[in-house]
């Protein structure tokens, strides 16, 4: 009658998460909320949580890739803290980044000092 109401109005577009817009698995909305609640700054830009989520996702993927390789080397199909420890400590850059981090149930890297190894003598080769 008077042209009011929702006749012929456009249907609202399907909601799309910021993570899917950015092509990420990590939750951009949650990272944004945590940045706002954490009192890091008075205001948080729209791109900051996307960038931070992307960085966190990349680091996680890198560590899991190396830990998966460590698990496969040990003939295991499940990644355990020991595999994470081996992955991080054997990678120079990750070891520097996570140098002060302790991983529970991670153990230590196998390492025997060179002076403790048996000496290789050539006495039995020269028996003339």
Curated annotation (Swiss-Prot):
Name recorded for this polypeptide: Histone H2A type 1-J
Q: Which domain of life is it from?
A: Eukaryota
**Residue(s) carrying Phosphoserine:** 2
List residues modified as N6-(beta-hydroxybutyryl)lysine.
10, 14, 37, 96, 119
The modified positions for N6-glutaryllysine read 96, 100, 119-120, 126
Xref: PROSITE patterns: HISTONE_H2A
Q: Which family does it belong to?
A: Belongs to the histone H2A family.
Q: How is it modified after translation?
A: Deiminated on Arg-4 in granulocytes upon calcium entry.
Q: What is the lineage of its organism?
A: Eukaryota, Metazoa, Chordata, Craniata, Vertebrata
Q: Per the UniProt entry, what species is this protein from, by scientific name?
A: Homo sapiens
Which residue windows does the record flag with biased composition (Basic residues)?
7-19
Phosphothreonine PTM positions: 121
């Amino acid at each position: 009658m008077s042209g009011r109401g929702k006749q012929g109005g456009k249907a609202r577009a399907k909601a799309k998460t910021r993570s899917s817009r950015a092509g990420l698995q990590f939750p951009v909305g949650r990272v944004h909320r945590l940045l706002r609640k954490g009192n890091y700054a008075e205001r948080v830009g729209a791109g900051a949580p996307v960038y931070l989520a992307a960085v966190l996702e990349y680091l996680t993927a890198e560590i899991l890739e190396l830990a998966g390789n460590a698990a496969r080397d040990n003939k295991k199909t499940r990644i355990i803290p020991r595999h994470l420890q081996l992955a991080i400590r054997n990678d120079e850059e990750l070891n520097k980044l996570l140098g002060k981090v302790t991983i529970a149930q991670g153990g230590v890297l196998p390492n025997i000092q060179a002076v403790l190894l048996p000496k290789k003598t050539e006495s039995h080769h020269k028996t003339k």
